[in-house]
Amino acid sequence: MEVLMAERANLVFHNKAIDGTAMKRLISRLIEHFGMAYTSHILDQVKTLGFQQATATSISLGIDDLLTIPSKGWLVQDAEQQSLILEKHHQYGNVHAVEKLRQSIEIWYATSEYLRQEMNPNFRMTDPFNPVHIMSFSGARGNASQVHQLVGMRGLMSDPQGQMIDLPIQSNLREGLSLTEYIISCYGARKGVVDTAVRTSDAGYLTRRLVEVVQHIVVRRTDCGTARGISVSPRNGIMPERIFSQTLIGRVLADDIYMGSRCIATRNQAIGIGLVNRFITFRAQPISIRTPFTCRSTSWICRLCYGRSPTHGDLVELGEAVGIIAGQSIGEPGTQLTLRTFHTGGVFTGGTAEHVRAPSNGKIKFNEDLVHPTRTRHGHPAFLCSIDLYVTIESEDILHNVNIPPKSLLLVQNDQYVESEQVIAEIRAGISTLNFKEKVRKHIYSDSDGEMHWSTDVYHAPEFTYGNVHLLPKTSHLWILLGGPCRSSLVYLSIHKDQDQMNAHSLSGKRRYTSNLSVTNDQARQKLFSSDFYGQKEDRIPDYSDLNRIICTGQYNLVYSPILHGNSALLSKRRRNKFIIPLHSIQELENELMPCSGISIEIPVNGIFRRNSILAYFDDPRYRRKSSGIIKYGTIETHSVIKKEDLIEYRGVKEFRPKYQMKVDRFFFIPEEVHILPGSSSLMVRNNSIVGVDTQITLNLRSRVGGLVRVERKKKRIELKIFSGDIHFPGETDKISRHTGVLIPPGTGKRNSKEYKKVQNWIYVQRITPSKKRFFVLVRPVVTYEITDGINLGTLFPPDPLQERDNVQLRIVNYILYGNGKPIRGISDTSIQLVRTCLVLNWNQDKKSSSCEEARASFVEIRTNGLIRHFLKINLVKSPISYIGKRNDPSGSGLLSDNGSDCTNINPFSAIYSYSKAKIQQSLNQPQGTIHTLLNRNKECQSLIILSAANCSRMEPFKDVKYHSVIKESIKKDPLIPIRNSLGPLGTCLPIENFYSSYHLITHNQILVTKYLQLDNLKQTFQVIKLKYYLMDENGKIFNPDPCRNIILNPFNLNWSFLHHYYCAETSKIISLGQFICENVCIAKNGPPLKSGQVILVQVDSIVIRSAKPYLATPGATVHGHYGETLYEGDTLVTFIYEKSRSGDITQGLPKVEQVLEVRSIDSISMNLEKRVEGWNKCIPRILGIPWGFLIGAELTIAQSRISLVNKIQQVYRSQGVQIHNRHIEIIVRQITSKVLISEDGMSNVFSPGELIGLLRAERMGRALEEAICYRVVLLGITRASLNTQSFISEASFQETARVLAKAALRGRIDWLKGLKENVVLGGVIPVGTGFKGLVHPSKQHNNIPLETKKTNLFEGEMRDILFHHRKLFDSCLSKKFHDIPEQSFIGFNDS
């Protein structure tokens, strides 16, 4: 005691609170100095002191001790304000759902963390002896984050899936939770009693599995004689000293350590604190230590490889059951881990980035060429710099240079004024070692019914080419235009005026109009009507009987006609994009039997005509043949000059043959009968024989004409032709007979020894040689066709009086459908058309404007005076930007009457089919409307824009719009483009000034010409009125829409938003029809803010907007559904894929340990590992030759994966402050990595492929057999490792008892009872315990060791050289692949 007193006088007094960690350090120092007994004596005194003090203090805890932090109120208010702004941005479509989620999480997380940090200083100042404050530090129960929930705020919770619930709990437990908050906290809080119980059972099961793997590992020897070790390096300061010393203390050195030439530590020396400190100060070379990994034995471990026993600081005793200790020391902290709270909310804790702040106030400048715009992960605009960027901040007197590292985000613009400490850049956090990233899908669902539009191109995902999954290539908005299919008989608001073309949009063919209501409004007379219909969805021809009623109210004249859902049930008169005009013409008078023919007007599927396209064709019945034959153009080739440019490829629907344009007035058709028979059929006639009419050719085929039979055998079929005509055996003198295949005009004399006669008609001479010596001539009859030129077109298409140039021209061209000498085959009694009269579309090229390359055509139906007329409308398209259409309205001068008798000399093309009232029942009406022509003052250009779908509407010119002067000048220069930059087509998001540059629409004093067609006198009356409105084609982009697209929406069940506006001269916002407008865009001066939507109607003083909801989507998002599709509330719109950092938090910690130990893939590293394993297994044998190759490849792979597994498990525990010695984890990892899988190739007779054996056993067997055994490394999980041990009794007592025992019995396995568990099961003595060493015979040991060491040393030497040779290779691999290992710098392989 006196000694103690004497020492006490010299001791230093530390006035510090001592906590758990300090206490641990103190005890370990005490044991170092004084030994165990003395230390326990000292600790007893400390304990007594503590109990005395605690009794005296008498801490009590009442609800009054919970003091709320005063700053909480405004902090929460601030966070709420931020999330409100965020919500607004989301509504405007500026940020998408994932960005919103991230940002709100960060807002609330920051608030909650700030409160937590404020808590302690606050307590310290106001009430330092507050029991809550004291308890939160004691470490006994409760910690800062739990107290924070009592007095701070609970903040964000996460649901059982670990997803964040973005409704923060703002109250703390002192203030009391609201009902919602209570439910959320029950849902997401993982601190319930149940949870603890579940976690405890998990940890218990983990312990059981761990012990199962390693229960047989016992310390059996002092030294296994290995020369290998793992090198740990203290240099670079990369590894924290604490971890470094923890790794080293208690280990045994595998090699001597030199400082220069002086040896400071020898091999097999245990490392204590002093030695570690010396290493740290000297920064010596890498230190090679022995670990359980390097121990040479399979089923036990030696004292030196294990190191010191953690209980009493000496080398571990022989007979110590270190396996069970290891299993328990890993599993037991699991129960501690589970009791940790879920304080961070689980997600997004690793997502905070470092900020660069401005050093002083000033103007910021940087080189804009080095950055490109991007979005931050919160959706804010920013610049991304790809290389180092120097930013200069100019304050009044000084220049500051700030260097911004690559891959950083710049949050300010060039020349912007920044204040001191303002965040100017965000540095992307490097790859954080602690947090694994995982990809999460987030689905966005629609809030309302509506029609989907998007404002950019989308790609189809390749595997869903025909599905509805689209990938977005760039950031864009998706719009849901409100308004669903109409289900009820509501009173709708109509915004259509007289003669507008519109769709009735019913889902079925029946609709009844019940009542007409007329309402007077201040603006104008709005017509309201109600309609109900039955939602029958079958495709059937509707009953049109009640559709003739025209509903009139005042001056409005609205006629509705239904359109069927889909095109399957259309009447035969109108096929898809094809219109046939029946023509009862000349032929019908001559021959009643000929089928009636008609003009077919065909529009390509996409509705676009190129120059010289064929618009319509007429198949003249005179040029129709029933039989097969051959076409010839004439006797001499000059008749058939075919110029290249006159060859027009016909882009039809059915036929794809080229057409030959004829410059000649006649051609010839040589008939023949052709039968194509299968190769197996038996013919009843021979080649070159002559048959009569109706001769039997095969069993079920008879000839139609008589004549000469020719049989040609092709590969799989027989072609049999019958030529009618005369057979002529020529004499020596006949000249003509030398020619073959010539046409002879009439009047040519033909001499013969027997007869002489004049040829009456054209004939065709063909020479036939049945054998070498004989030949004869076949004279075949020829049918001659004359082709007459078309009638002059000028009279048929009266030129448009208002049109002065850029006229669309139509010319008639006759095409022969078959080339010269082409055989024609008739298939089963169909008639063959030889000549087709075609109407070719062409137009003048305008020199000033860009040439029109394509024209868009469609059919329009107009009802005038109770009759329905079809018009063909053709617009020319100048270029994608300016939409200047050309009008072609061939309102015919020759209308056909029904009997067709007076139409004999009218060219068929001038007629446009018109219906009488009686025919309305049969016809299927298209949407109705009118064609309007726009002219400008100088009559220089016009456009034809039709109001086609109900989503479009009219637009009026704006009065007193202040144009920019630039635009005025451009109008003067180029008066040809009055409509600038296109009228925005529907479905295209025309830019809005706040986001992008604005598109302008300019009109000046145009007049509208409406053409009324009156059927009674067939006069064209023009009515010139002041321009009232524009109409706009839905397909501003000149693509024909999908034919079923305009079916579903009812145009009136929409939400309208009316806005009267007087333009702000400042913003000079010019609205184009079909433009999408976001909510926060100011359009009107002092007008109310708009709802988001699409402009569908523009009047002089107001616009009508169809409400729409924007959703922002970023690249890589998947869009579900098709463009224009109707969606219902709750349908999935978009799926985002985003990365979130998985929490390093411990509630996910225990499962994470389990994942690592069961070797389930937790992130991409496992994939890399497997590839590396394969790579090593391939390249090492190549370097080293076969025998050593597999072994070394396997060894290196195993060593690498072992270290990585140990580090991963340690990370989880260390992040929670739980200390576990590495060697425990190493023993477990060694067991799950010590097996190899015998592979198929090189099958040896020892092991069967697919068998799992120990690595060392494979190595020994290979050496004994002196042949290579092919195997590859496997990582077994702990469960699989438990089921693959030496002992079947231990396996059976773990899992799958029946299976294991049955297999063992069948295989005749022997259990040597080496482990603990087998002996416990059978009630034997367990072969462990520190008194066990007396049983081992010393003589045996001595005999065994030298032999083994010789062999291994030989091997070790080779291995060492190889390893040093490949050390560099390894290091590079390591740094690349294992980026998540914090100790990467000091791991090498050392085999000294």
Swiss-Prot record:
Keyword DNA-binding in the entry? The reply is no
Give its E.C. classification number. 2.7.7.6
Tell me the keywords, alphabetical order.
Chloroplast, DNA-directed RNA polymerase, Metal-binding, Nucleotidyltransferase, Plastid, Transcription, Transferase, Zinc
Show the GO MF annotations: DNA binding; DNA-directed RNA polymerase activity; zinc ion binding
Q: How is the cofactor bound?
A: Binds 1 Zn(2+) ion per subunit.
Record carries keyword Chloroplast = yes
**What InterPro entries does the entry give?**
DNA-dir_RpoC2_beta_pp, RNA_pol_beta''_euk, RNA_pol_Rpb1_3_sf, RNA_pol_Rpb1_4, RNA_pol_Rpb1_5, Rpb1_funnel_sf
Its domain of life?
Answer: Eukaryota
Co-factor(s):
Zn(2+)
Compartments in which it is found = Plastid, Chloroplast
Residues annotated for Zn(2+) binding in this entry: 224, 295, 302, 305
Q: Name one GO cellular component term.
A: mitochondrion
Extract the Pfam families matched here: RNA_pol_Rpb1_4, RNA_pol_Rpb1_5
Task: Please list the reactions this protein catalyses.
Answer: RNA(n) + a ribonucleoside 5'-triphosphate = RNA(n+1) + diphosphate
Family matches, as CDD domains: RNAP_beta'_C
Question: Which GO terms of type biological process are on file?
Answer: DNA-templated transcription
Membership in a protein family: Belongs to the RNA polymerase beta' chain family. RpoC2 subfamily.
The record's note on quaternary structure and interaction partners says:
In plastids the minimal PEP RNA polymerase catalytic core is composed of four subunits: alpha, beta, beta', and beta''. When a (nuclear-encoded) sigma factor is associated with the core the holoenzyme is formed, which can initiate transcription.
What does the record give as the function of this protein? DNA-dependent RNA polymerase catalyzes the transcription of DNA into RNA using the four ribonucleoside triphosphates as substrates.
**Under which name does UniProt file this protein?**
DNA-directed RNA polymerase subunit beta''
Q: Which organism is it from?
A: Solanum lycopersicum (Tomato)
This protein's gene is called rpoC2
